[in-house]
From Swiss-Prot:
UniProt-listed PANTHER family: NUCLEOTIDE KINASE (PTHR23359)
Binding site for ATP: 11-16, 125, 134-135, 199
Reactions catalysed: AMP + ATP = 2 ADP
Name used for this protein in its record: Adenylate kinase
Top enzyme class: transferase
UniProt function note: Catalyzes the reversible transfer of the terminal phosphate group between ATP and AMP. Plays an important role in cellular energy homeostasis and in adenine nucleotide metabolism.
Binding residues annotated for AMP, in chain numbering: 32, 37, 59-61, 87-90, 94, 160, 171
Domain text: Consists of three domains, a large central CORE domain and two small peripheral domains, NMPbind and LID, which undergo movements during catalysis. The LID domain closes over the site of phosphoryl transfer upon ATP binding. Assembling and dissambling the active center during each catalytic cycle provides an effective means to prevent ATP hydrolysis. Some bacteria have evolved a zinc-coordinating structure that stabilizes the LID domain.
Amino acid sequence: MIRLIFLGAPGTGKGTISSYLKEQHGFFHISSGDLFRFYAKEEKTALAEEIKSYINNGLYVPDELTNRTVADFYHKNQSQDKIIFDGYPRTLNQCEYIDEIIKFTHVILLQPTDWDMIINRLSLRRSCPQCKRIYNINSVDFKPKVANLCDLCKVELIHRKDDDPSVVSTRINVYNEQTKPVIEYYKKKNLLHVVDANKSFEELYKLVLEIVNK
C-alpha cells in the first residue's frame, strides 16, 4: 500500500506527475484544491455547505476545515491501494492532524535550482476546466494536439490568473515560507526525498517511480 505526499511550489510538476501516475499506474489522486471545488459543487452535506461559505466569499479555507475535508474524502476512498496527496498537507498543523489518520510511505519534495525556469513554465501553462489535465503550449510533449483544446474533453483550455508572472513570484514565496516547517517535519521522520524540479519531465518521472517502487 502506497501513501505518497507531493511537496513543491506551484509549477514544479506535482500535478503533471500525479496525472501520469494516475493514468499509467493506477494511483488515486487527492488534490486539496480540487476537493474544495468538488464538495462545494457536488456534495449536499453540512461539511460542503461550510466549505461553500468560504469559497463563495473568496476566503481562505482554515486548517481545521481543510483537515476535516481531506479526512472525510480519505475515509470514503481508503480502500484504494495507491494514493497521492497533492497540495496537502501544507502546514505543520495539517501534518500533525493527518499523521494521526494515515501512515505515509513516501514524501517527495520537488525542489528547483532555477526559479526563473519555473516562473516561465507557469506562464505557458494551460489547463482543462473539466478533467484538470495540464498542458504547456511551448512543449513538444505537453502541448495539446489541437491548439487550445483539451485532448480528452475537447473543451477550450484556460490560463489561470494566478499563473501570470506578476502573481507567480508571490505564490512561490508564500508557499516556500509556509512549507518550511512541513519539510523539516518529514525530514525528521526520514520520509523525505528531494528531487530537482528543473530536470526534464522524463527524468523527474523516472526518479519518482524509482522512489515509490523502493
